[in-house]
């Protein structure tokens, strides 16, 4: 047991020593990192990169105190203005001045390769943007020495060949929609004309008449079916009334036939009388004529 306790105490002491070493190592590493960062900052302040236009190292503490960088009103002179213009040209390489020398073109040859331009009549196209110039860009491309700067407007291109502004795109869309509506209206008018012609066609009129007659016949048939579905008493009364009506009709027909027979008899009698009269009058006249002659 004593050996075990001694062994455990040794292990605990070793763990304490390792923890102390580990904590001291971390603090030492943090101190070294902080020291390295401070050294790097000091090195960066001492080793600032030179600008392309500088030939010697710039002293930020002393050079701005020189009188040549200040005028009477404590403003920067033309050198600072030129530097600002160069920075603007680097930020906006598409913008060009009208008064550019040939030397500037030679210096900016790499920029021209990075930003190619297509020369049209009144537009200068680049990728992915198109620049519209209010003046004639041919003056810029031909290096005319004008003292005015071209005013550029950046808008996205519609296609690689044709450049349109948003108003032109909207106008084209409205024109296409108007054409589609006109075609639909014309088609609708043609369909209406065809329907009117079909309705006024004689065959169509005949078909309508036949349909109406068919409806009338169907209604009559249904009415007749309803009448046949009446109870027996009513049907007997109807049959008796129909028989009486038929008898009356037959009697009337007999009367008419009798009248016709009487008329025929009268006509025959009148014809016989006329014949008798004609035969009785002929002999005396002939005898008299014969006697007188």
Swiss-Prot record:
Extent of Low complexity compositional bias: 117-148, 232-283
Residue stretches of biased makeup (Acidic residues): 37-47, 56-91, 99-112
Region (Disordered): 20-148, 226-283
Gene Ontology MF: a single term: histone acetyltransferase activity
Coiled-coil portions: none
Protein name: Putative uncharacterized protein DDB_G0272194
Organism taxonomic ancestry: Eukaryota, Amoebozoa, Evosea, Eumycetozoa, Dictyostelia
């Amino acid at each position: 047991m004593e050996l075990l306790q001694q062994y455990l105490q040794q292990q605990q002491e070793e763990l304490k020593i390792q923890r102390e070493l580990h904590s001291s190592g971390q603090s030492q590493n943090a101190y070294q990192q902080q020291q390295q960062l401070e050294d790097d900052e000091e090195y960066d302040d001492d080793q600032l990169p030179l600008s392309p236009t500088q030939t010697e190292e710039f002293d930020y503490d002393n050079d701005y105190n020189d009188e040549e960088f200040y005028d009477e009103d404590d403003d920067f002179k033309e050198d600072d203005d030129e530097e600002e213009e160069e920075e603007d040209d680097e930020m906006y390489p598409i913008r060009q001045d009208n008064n550019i020398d040939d030397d500037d073109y030679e210096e900016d040859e790499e920029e021209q390769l990075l930003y190619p331009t297509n020369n049209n009549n009144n537009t200068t196209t680049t990728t992915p943007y198109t620049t519209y110039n209010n003046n004639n860009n041919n003056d810029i491309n031909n290096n005319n020495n004008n003292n005015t700067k071209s005013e550029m407007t950046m808008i996205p291109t519609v296609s690689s060949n044709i450049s349109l502004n948003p108003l032109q795109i909207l106008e084209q869309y409205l024109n296409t929609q108007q054409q589609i509506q006109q075609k639909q209206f014309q088609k609708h008018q043609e369909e209406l004309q065809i329907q009117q012609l079909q309705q006024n066609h004689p065959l169509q009129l005949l078909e309508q008449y036949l349909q109406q007659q068919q409806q009338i016949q169907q209604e009559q048939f249904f009415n007749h079916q309803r009448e046949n579905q009446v109870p027996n008493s009513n049907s007997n009364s109807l049959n008796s009334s129909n028989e009486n009506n038929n008898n009356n009709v037959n009697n009337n027909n007999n009367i008419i036939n009798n009248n016709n027979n009487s008329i025929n008899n009268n006509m025959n009698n009148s014809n016989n009388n006329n014949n008798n009269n004609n035969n009785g009058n002929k002999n005396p006249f002939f005898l008299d004529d014969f006697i007188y002659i």
